[in-house]
Amino acid sequence: MYVTFATCWYSLNSKFPADTYLHWMRHMLAEVTNYNLVLFTDAEGELLLRDHFAPYYFKNPHIKIVQKPIENWHNYQYKDSWIKNHAKNTLLNGKTEWKLNMLWAEKINFVNEARINQYFPETDFYGWCDIGYFREGPCPTFCNTPKILALNKNKIYYACVNPLQFTALKEIVQRKNEYGLPLVPIPPDQASIAGGFFIAHHSKIEGWRKMFDEKLRLYFQHNYLVKDDQIILVDCFLSEPQRFELRGSAGGSAPTPPSESSAKQSLENPWFEFRRFLG
């Protein structure tokens, strides 16, 4: 194996009902063959998963369930800041809860834990893959060895969903105040980088975790909005673009992530770029 992914399942007030995520989850769990998967959840979540899925899914030697209560997340230390942030997060606070926003920022910490604790023997690459990433069905060829070995070990890979926004965003991010934050805050409605998947060489994971965490704390310290993972991601990327490689370059406005019924749209949607690139 050359890659280990982290993912998670927690019962939170999310974008879709639980049954929808369980349907997508089946697509992922059915074809964990070319990579290792560490699935973080809590005690309630593990009971639900083992009740919903046949036992053979979790007999796969490449799948490891790890119980990690929300209170033990790295980002839980910022609980008060997350709650305060959610109160002013007008685009999302009527649809989701603050814990979901915290989860979006926890992804790199889950990946780093999978790397450090070595639930599987160390692999060359580590990454994050949303539990609902395979909406159109299983992908048995996902992350086969030649595709993983072709990755640049010096880059952190994400998907670009709207390149036309980057010129304006670059001007915003690079005009910083004395604290190192954008002088004019990043617009909360921008969507530029897909946070549902990333992959990087194991030597880049701790540095990326540290960069993300420092940026997040800076936003909280100065009461800047953290709408979801979008704002922190694009700030990090445009502050140090040499560390990243963005996949996908088709122009146009950012499409809305597809619903559970739009399989063809999912295959073509830049939010799911790595389903194609590594599939």
What label would you give each PLM region?
Residues 157-170:
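Short beta-strand-to-loop element that shapes/binds the nucleotide-sugar donor at the catalytic cleft/hinge
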Residues 99, 104-160:
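GT-A fold catalytic core of metal-dependent nucleotide-sugar glycosyltransferases
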Residues 135-139, 179-279:
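Catalytic core and acceptor-binding pocket of nucleotide-sugar-dependent glycosyltransferases
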Residues 17-27, 108, 140-146, 231:
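Well-ordered, non-membrane alpha-helical segments in soluble/globular domains
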Residues 23-36, 55:
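Short, acidic, metal-binding catalytic loop of nucleotide-sugar glycosyltransferases
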Residues 58-118:
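Active-site-proximal specificity loops/subdomain of glycosyltransferases
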Residues 1-23:
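N-proximal low-complexity "stem/linker" segments adjacent to membrane-targeting elements
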Residues 46-61, 79-80, 172-173:
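Short, aromatic/basic amphipathic alpha-helical patches
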